[in-house]
Amino acid sequence: MAATVVSGAQVAIAFVVALIAGIAALLLSTALGK
């Protein structure tokens, strides 16, 4: 049970990090485009 919770948390953290990185890249490309 504990291992499942830990892996789930790692997946959630990785997802959030990827989401933030994607948004940052989008904003950066938009700023450079202008």
From Swiss-Prot:
The keyword Cell membrane applies. It is a single-pass membrane protein. The gene is psaM. GO terms for biological process: photosynthesis. The chain crosses the membrane at residues 11-31. It is found in: Cell inner membrane. The keyword Hydrolase does not apply. InterPro entries: PSI_PsaM. NCBIfam families: PS_I_psaM (TIGR03053). Keywords: Cell inner membrane, Cell membrane, Membrane, Photosynthesis, Photosystem I, Transmembrane, Transmembrane helix. Signal peptide: none annotated. Its main location: membrane. Belongs to the PsaM family. It holds the Pfam family PsaM. The G.violaceus PSI reaction center is composed of one copy each of PsaA,B,C,D,E,F,L,M and Z, and forms trimeric complexes. This is Photosystem I reaction center subunit XII. Coiled coil: none annotated. GO terms for cellular component: photosystem I; plasma membrane.
